[in-house]
């Protein structure tokens, strides 16, 4: 999320009454100060908050909600009662949305954001409350978010979604959008392949038009020789190599030998591929360069721009 998120659709209405009821139990413990409560009741409330936040944020791997809930009475809140660092977020929930209490947040010394809605903001920001005087009108708790390294999610079938990531970790296939620099031996402009962790390449589409036949090559160099250059039987005369010993999709320490590759077979799988193609078509600003060298004299160098989308599919 950004440094500030305002919840203005009553996202926390379901737990507002729980907080009011909790306040009835603990209010007598203090007269003129903020009070922080931690109990089995606050653990239940924290779990409810966590479930609500999971629905609000995409690509979140983990959400931690502190079971310490602070009821705020003064305009200025001494945050040392909540946390001793500035990592993560504060969540402010108003006990009564009809009151005139406001949260004032200062992203910069010259800028102030004012809200009367439930709000979540980075602990690194300066803030204060306005019109918090005679009674407890809001609560605060500490939130920690851990995000997946994910670009988006695509529906795979009726019961499953697949994360599309720019990270190799935890994934077993890479969808590569490959754009070739102009060369007199190359007629294609863009080609897309699925590369598994052994380096095998499934030709998916060219010019963003999907292939129906499943063409699988042992390496990207083989794919180039057979499909791009159309020189399948000239290995004795002309070969391709990457001088750095790199794979087009995977770091060398991620490569595994002998892996089968995923092949689309069902309508759901072909629909998934089509969705992946569309995502890649409009989200390809980040790319790496990959070069293949032909053993001519002098050497022929082919340069490719590669945008990579990592996924994890279960297959045998």
Swiss-Prot record:
Keyword Magnesium found: no
Induction: Expressed in the early phase of the viral replicative cycle.
InterPro entries found in the cross-reference section: Poxvirus_C4/C10 (IPR005004)
Highest taxon of source: Viruses
Its job: Plays a role in the inhibition of host NF-kappa-B activation. Mechanistically, blocks the subunit p65/RELA translocation into the host nucleus.
Family: Belongs to the poxviridae OPG031 protein family.
Cellular component per GO, a single term: host cell cytoplasm
Protein name, as recorded: Protein C4
Species assigned in the record: Variola virus (isolate Human/India/Ind3/1967) (VARV)
A Pfam family hit: Pox_C4_C10
UniProt keyword terms in alphabetical order: Early protein, Host cytoplasm, Host nucleus
Gene that this sequence comes from: OPG031
Locations listed in the record: Host cytoplasm; Host nucleus
């Amino acid at each position: 999320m950004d440094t500030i998120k305002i919840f203005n659709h009553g996202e926390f209405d379901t737990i507002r009454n729980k907080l009011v009821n909790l306040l009835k139990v603990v209010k007598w413990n203090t007269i003129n100060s903020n009070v922080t409560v931690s109990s089995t009741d606050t653990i239940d409330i924290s779990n409810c908050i966590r479930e609500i936040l999971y629905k609000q944020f995409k690509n979140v791997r983990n959400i931690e909600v502190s079971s310490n809930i602070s009821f705020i009475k003064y305009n200025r809140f001494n945050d040392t009662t909540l946390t001793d660092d500035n990592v993560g977020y504060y969540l402010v929930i108003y006990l009564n949305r009809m009151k005139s209490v406001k949260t004032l947040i200062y992203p910069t010394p010259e800028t102030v954001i004012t809200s009367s809605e439930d709000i979540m903001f980075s602990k690194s920001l300066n803030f204060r409350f306005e019109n918090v005087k005679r009674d407890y009108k809001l609560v605060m708790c500490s939130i920690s978010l851990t995000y997946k390294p994910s670009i988006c999610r695509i529906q795979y079938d009726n019961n499953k979604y697949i994360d599309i990531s720019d990270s190799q970790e935890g994934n077993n296939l890479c969808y590569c959008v490959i754009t070739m620099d102009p060369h007199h031996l190359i007629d294609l402009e863009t080609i897309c392949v699925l590369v598994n962790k052994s380096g095998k390449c499934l030709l998916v589409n060219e010019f963003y038009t999907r292939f129906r036949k499943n063409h699988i090559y042992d390496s990207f160099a083989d794919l180039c020789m057979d499909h791009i250059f159309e020189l399948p039987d000239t290995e004795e005369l002309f070969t391709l190599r990457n001088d750095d010993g790199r794979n087009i999709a995977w770091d060398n320490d991620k490569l595994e030998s002998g892996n089968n590759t995923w092949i689309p077979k069902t309508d759901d799988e072909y629909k998934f591929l089509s969705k992946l193609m569309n995502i890649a078509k409009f989200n390809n600003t980040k790319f790496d360069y990959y070069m293949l060298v032909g053993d001519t004299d002098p050497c022929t160098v082919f340069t490719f721009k590669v945008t990579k989308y990592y996924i994890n599919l279960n297959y045998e």
